[in-house]
Amino acid sequence: MSTPGTLHIVATPIGNLGDLSPRAQHILRTVTMICAEDTRHTRQLLAHFGIERPLLALHAHNEDTLAERIITRLISGASLALVSDAGTPLISDPGFLLVRAARAAGIRVTPVPGPSALIAALSVSGLPSNRFTFEGFLPAKPTARRDRLTHLAHEPRTLIFYEASHRIAECLTDLATIFGSMRAAVVARELTKIFETVLDGTLATLQTQVANDDNQRKGEFVIIVQGAADQDAAKITEGRRVYALLKEHLPPSSAAKLAAEITGAPRKALYGG
């Protein structure tokens, strides 16, 4: 019986090709096959380093159906690498279903660490980094996005979001409206690329800067927002404690309303939290 292969989770550059580590290059040269979110994009990356390996497209629309086929290959002894278009796989990218299936099948899954836009942005933000929460992409529809932000408005940890260029201005507007215009934040754009910018200030000033500069609405964005003040965080914590007790005896909406009246915490933050 053959020894099962290994699934390597390989981080790739988010912009600067010099950030692909020697170990990552070695793994990509030697694996049996590479699973890639976009094979065309990955083929260009491999060509830059003179690497030629078979590629298999693995993305959000086919991951659930391909996972079993890939696991079969791993069990038979093949070694595979999983890459995304940029950065560390699984972070707001496909791969979770495959990794879960591989671990369930007893396959060794090992990380090949490297670039990550959220960590890169946090490291240069100047905002507290000892505790943070990553929310990925906010909902595209305005109502759903505002609801999500309302539930996060009193989160005490530093908040990190990804955002697309065509939504960055309206996202900052919603953040300033819901979190408060004076909340400190950072907008990191095109990290490690030629036109990299890292803007800091209040949500109000950042919204104005981005709205008034076409160049600041191009590229890929990471938004980092300072957590809520301790007083707000204490209110929401107490509100959720009271809400949990009241919910045992009242409908959720009524429990949230009463808990908000008792503690001063926002009702929506309790009902959705």
Swiss-Prot record:
Listed under GO cellular component are: cytoplasm
Describe the reaction catalysed, as an equation.
cytidine(1402) in 16S rRNA + S-adenosyl-L-methionine = 2'-O-methylcytidine(1402) in 16S rRNA + S-adenosyl-L-homocysteine + H(+)
Reported EC number(s) for this entry are 2.1.1.198
Q: Which domain of life is it from?
A: Bacteria
* SUPFAM superfamilies noted in UniProt: Tetrapyrrole methylase (SSF53790)
| Major subcellular location class | cytoplasm
Family (UniProt): Belongs to the methyltransferase superfamily. RsmI family.
> What is this protein for, i.e. what is its function?
Catalyzes the 2'-O-methylation of the ribose of cytidine 1402 (C1402) in 16S rRNA.
State the name under which the record lists this protein: Ribosomal RNA small subunit methyltransferase I
Organism, by scientific name, is: Xylella fastidiosa (strain 9a5c)
Q: What is the lineage of its organism?
A: Bacteria, Pseudomonadati, Pseudomonadota, Gammaproteobacteria, Lysobacterales
Q: Which gene encodes it?
A: rsmI
